[in-house]
Amino acid sequence: MDVNRFFCTALLIATAGLFATSASAAESVAPQCESGPRDMEYIYEHGAQTRCFYPAMTLEETYQALRKARSDRQNLTPTLTPGKDRKIENLGDTDLVEYVWKGKNNLHITQNFPGGMTEFMFTVDKSGTTVTEIGHPD
């Protein structure tokens, strides 16, 4: 009887460890990023572009990971309200931040600053979420 209890306890501990490992793996997945051209002529015409793919992450998980990684996180709301468009004045260093949902799998965020504008486009597909960031200087 003690041997059965030992094996059941060991199995329970091993199973709990697997769940914890898979949960933390999803949280610690590094995004795969690529940047567009960085010469100033291109940036003034098209903006400074960066595209990052977050594998196996939902839009909300990606938003939180992106926000957490940024030093200017105060310019993004702490939480999302899926499907609800919002305009927020004077959030962090911004003049205005707009959240516009284009369906449940697409979110467009526009941050207006005194010195320019930054856009974030979140697009979800079955393999994860892509975020395109475009910074437009004045």
Which residues does each predicted region cover?
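N-terminal signal peptide c-region/cleavage motif recognized by signal peptidases
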Residues: 20-23
